[in-house]
Amino acid sequence: MSRSTHASGHMETVQVISALTDYIDQSKFAEIHSKLKRGDGPGESGKSTIFQIIGIAGRPSLSKSSEFSLKATEITLLSTCYHMLPDDYFGLLPLSSASVNATSTLLSTATISRPSFSVQTSSSTFANFLMSGTSWRSRRQRLKIVDVGGQRSQRRKLTAELAQDIKALWADPGIQNTFQRSSEFQLNDSAAYYFDSIDRISQPLYLPSENDVLRSRTKTTGIIETVFEIQNSTFRMVDVGGQRELANAHTELNNPIVQREEFVKQLRNRDKGDDESMEIDEGFVAALEHALPPTGGWGLGIDRLVMFLTSQSNIKEVLLFPAMKPEGKNAISYPPGTRCSMVRVFPCCSSTLTFSFCFFFSPFFMTVILFVEAAAMKVRGGYSGTCLSVSPRFSNGGDVLWRTSETKRDKYNEKRHAAVKTPAQRSFLESGWNTASDVKCCSIRRFPYLPLPLSSSPFRFPPP
């Protein structure tokens, strides 16, 4: 089986040898070869075959005639073209049809069909390179879906009364000031042009001029996160840098059959009253039927990029107007200079617990109280907390790790069991109160300096 590929802009042929003995999983040999079509283009029999995009894993080798070959150990069908491609000489489309069905024209290797396409692409690439340092923005869209989502929702006609209301609002100084700061509010840069021409546009016999058409913008489809499954497991691709999530990656759906099914689901939502649901876009599905290669991408927000460049751990540090909790609502008051953070506790029993504790620092000594609050408290009158013997250990990053001693904890549990007074309290202690599932995740309060002995501290804890 042979397969032609493109390399450095030239057509080269690479021979792929697919033998049953070379496959790791021989059961997939018959399965994949039942889907693949031999050849690429008109063969010796004179019959054109269907264009396919496949992925091949194997090892390179040389044939007896010293021809470079690839022995395949696994072949994956990535995308299939469900249409016959036009022949270079006998299958050219008329110019009018090629303008509408540009997908087949672009896939054709005939240079006489539309030579301006290659010049157009090269010119656009060179222009983008020249204008990369300026505010110039290309207004040409490669793919436009005119009838999408809310654009078809109930549109109101621009009547004379509505035009006067819009004109009065546009004359307001506050609106003018807002438009001057349009970059902050992401307003359409053509809004001023249309508002100034509202009297002309609202005429019943209005015909758009050339400038009206050039300044108009059509809502296009965007790319959102795409969830894909591999071996019945769902994965999310995340670009991570400096132990922080920077961007979510996504892959495009290139299966036209599945894409049509998704459009049908959207139509069902439309029948239920969802006006934002899309109709079946036959042009988009037809383009997918011409074998879209595996496509992926990712989007990095400016805020996360600034976080990465400025080494900020919280996105609120880079936002101009972050969402903050109002003062006085569900807020806990701490002494001046208090800092809150989270610390993880790693007991010797391999269970990860998160505790709430306080530091009491003084110039001469440091006393640490570890306060554990059981989330599964079911007994009234029982202790709501306990103190454990801990030994501090500081990590390189400045976080504090606390490792409990299993021996000390067992001795403490024996004392606790001996001190209980009611069967209900004994039942609560025997139900595993010191496991990770029974402990709340609490905040950590750090007091940098408190020159008070523990006995006279204003903070009260339950007795051990």
UniProtKB/Swiss-Prot annotation:
G proteins are composed of 3 units; alpha, beta and gamma. The alpha chain contains the guanine nucleotide binding site. One of its GO terms (biological process) is lysyl-tRNA aminoacylation. InterPro entries: Aa-tRNA-synt_II (IPR004364), aa-tRNA-synth_II (IPR006195), aa-tRNA-synth_II/BPL/LPL (IPR045864), Gprotein_alpha_su (IPR001019), GproteinA_insert (IPR011025), NA-bd_OB-fold (IPR012340), P-loop_NTPase (IPR027417). Residues 235-244 are annotated as: G3 motif. Residues 212-220 are annotated as: G2 motif. Signal peptide: none annotated. In the N-terminal section; belongs to the G-alpha family. In the C-terminal section; belongs to the class-II aminoacyl-tRNA synthetase family. Keywords: GTP-binding, Magnesium, Metal-binding, Nucleotide-binding, Transducer. The keyword Repeat does not apply. GO terms for cellular component: cytosol. The keyword Nucleotide-binding applies. Residues 382-387 are annotated as: G5 motif. It comes from the Eukaryota. Mg(2+) binds at residues 48, 220. This is Putative guanine nucleotide-binding protein subunit alpha. It holds the Pfam family tRNA-synt_2. Residues 36-49 are annotated as: G1 motif.
